[in-house]
């Protein structure tokens, strides 16, 4: 299933994987998965985390390696009810709930994920997604960015 991904997608997922893989050992544990999900405002139980890992843990060792992670992401991308997931992701970024993601909100979430971005990098991300040029990202722009192939 992962063979349907573009090289660019694989590179993006590699970056995401390394955000999860806090100790850099090439695998994601339930603890690491929990840390990242909580930093995104989710609050999964230990059992839910274990289920998520078991779903994709092909070799049964209780952790997710990069090929398993790719399979999971490819499945998620095929999953068509992603509208709700995108809306949820938008809410994570839109801290004050005003319907827009500002540079400050984007920086805050990225910092929580362990990504230290310069102001210039944050502004660049906003510019790329900001279709109407108002300096922030509304929901429609966010959807466009998230679903861009």
Swiss-Prot record:
Record keywords, A-Z: Acetylation, Calcium, Metal-binding, Methylation, Repeat
UniProt: Ca(2+) 1 binding residues: 21, 23, 25, 27, 32
Annotated Ca(2+) 3 binding sites: 94, 96, 98, 100, 105
Modified residues (N-acetylalanine): 2
UniProt function note: Calmodulin acts as part of a calcium signal transduction pathway by mediating the control of a large number of enzymes, ion channels, aquaporins and other proteins through calcium-binding. Calcium-binding is required for the activation of calmodulin. Among the enzymes to be stimulated by the calmodulin-calcium complex are a number of protein kinases, such as myosin light-chain kinases and calmodulin-dependent protein kinase type II (CaMK2), and phosphatases.
The keyword Acetylation is assigned to this record: yes
Keyword Cytoplasm: no
Source species of the chain: Myxine glutinosa
Annotated positions binding Ca(2+) 2: 59, 61, 63, 68
Record protein name field: Calmodulin
InterPro entries listed in its UniProt record: CALM/Myosin/TropC-like (IPR050230), EF-hand-dom_pair (IPR011992), EF_Hand_1_Ca_BS (IPR018247), EF_hand_dom (IPR002048)
GO-annotated molecular function: calcium ion binding
Positions of Ca(2+) 4 binding: 130, 132, 134, 136, 141
Domain of life: Eukaryota
One CC-aspect GO term: myosin II complex
Something else known: This protein has four functional calcium-binding sites.
Alphabetical list of PANTHER family matching this protein: CALMODULIN LIKE 3, MYOSIN LIGHT CHAIN 1, 3
Domain EF-hand: 8-43, 44-79, 81-116, 117-149
Organism phylogeny: Eukaryota, Metazoa, Chordata, Craniata, Vertebrata
């Amino acid at each position: 299933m992962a063979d349907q991904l573009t090289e660019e997608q694989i590179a993006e997922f590699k970056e995401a994987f390394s955000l999860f893989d806090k100790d850099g050992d090439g695998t994601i544990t339930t603890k690491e998965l929990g840390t990242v999900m909580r930093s995104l405002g989710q609050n999964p139980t230990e059992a839910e985390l274990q289920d998520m890992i078991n779903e994709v843990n092909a070799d049964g060792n209780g952790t997710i390696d990069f090929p398993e992670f790719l399979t999971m992401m490819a499945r998620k991308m095929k999953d068509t009810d992603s509208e709700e997931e995108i809306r949820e992701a938008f809410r994570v970024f839109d801290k004050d709930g005003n319907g827009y993601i500002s540079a400050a909100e984007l920086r805050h979430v990225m910092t929580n994920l362990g990504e230290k971005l310069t102001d210039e990098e944050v502004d660049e991300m906003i510019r790329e997604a900001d279709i109407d040029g108002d300096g922030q990202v509304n929901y429609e722009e966010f959807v466009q960015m998230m679903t861009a192939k």
